[in-house]
Amino acid sequence: MNAITIRTTGEAEIFISSETIRPGHLIELDDDQSIHRYAAGHTKLFADGTNAAGSDPRTDHVAVIDHATGLMWAVKSIGDSDGDPMSQADCDKACRELRLLGYDDWGMPTRAELAALVDDTRHEPAIDTSLFPGVLPRWHWTSTPCAWSSASAWGVYFGHGYVSSLRRLSYGFALAVRRAGQ
């Protein structure tokens, strides 16, 4: 799906089909010309199909939508069937095979997408645990390869928030992501 994302800032307003988009709102214009409007922030998605604002204190949700980026994230670190870390290729496969909330188009995030989840005010894990309660304070793979070696890819360490390159055969976890609204 090709989509255009427009973020308003300051005093700007955008008028589309007689609808006003205010500062801090996110809109997406899809190929079929449908318009999706979102307030800035997060929405928690529960396994039973219900949802709640990101500020809701419950932590039994299975996914979260980040309206600033338009991304939907699974909220639990993905490892092997025993919950252990895996190679980058195995993490990528596990993300692509994920079936969650009726969606089958999950994948691994890019370096920029995953690094944006790091919360510098937190430690072990360095991520907002009210939104991502199941993220382990360990290395998490991205889909971004390293320019200098096809044997390496980028990862984010959620223990302290580091971003670094790792050999693809090293062991880590994954956070699955997809574009919301698809």
Where are the regions a protein language model picked out?
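Glycine-aromatic-enriched surface loops/turns that form tight recognition elements
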Residues: 1-107, 112-182
